[in-house]
Amino acid sequence: FLQTKPGLVGNFTYGKYTKSSLNFGGYNMEFYTKAVDNKVVASYGETLGTALDFYTKKFGDSNSGKKIIVAQIDDESLDFYSTQGMIFMATRLLEQPREITEERLQREAAYQWWGLTVGLKSFDDVWLSQGLAEYSAVTLRESTTDAAKLEDLRRSEGVIVDEVGARTRLARQSTTPGGAPVPLKIGDTLELND
């Protein structure tokens, strides 16, 4: 392996895999899986390819180039892990496809830019890459959602758009003692509690 630009330490996985190659939006994606339904691989490939294409158009090329590898790992590890040009996914995510997994895959794709292409000065800056990756994924979902569903998406994502178009991600909207959401207005100051 040769890496000519500074970056985080890479990783590898070893096992008996089935290789599935997909092309989407100019990206060559290789999925290395163990006994996973081809429809799931195709669906995740489309999700990943759409995300990579969107981020490339929005932010320019990432250091990982036009090839990305997705490798299945065991459930005893993390759900996802991203390194330059590679995304690791836990087995359960490939065996039980859900919408939330596709949303997280969009975020993992964004790490090819935030934290890997745009590096971190120190470990204390990790929150920046996490926030920018989440922002990128929400922006992608907003761009592919019709107006009727956009408000629901913003509420479920906890995103409020102010009058100048700046986006602020909230952990969760506050609720009244009865459980009803507290109405928020542009310019409100929010206190987020753990």
Q: Locations of the language-model features?
A:
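Structured beta-strand-rich cores of soluble
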Residues: 1-26
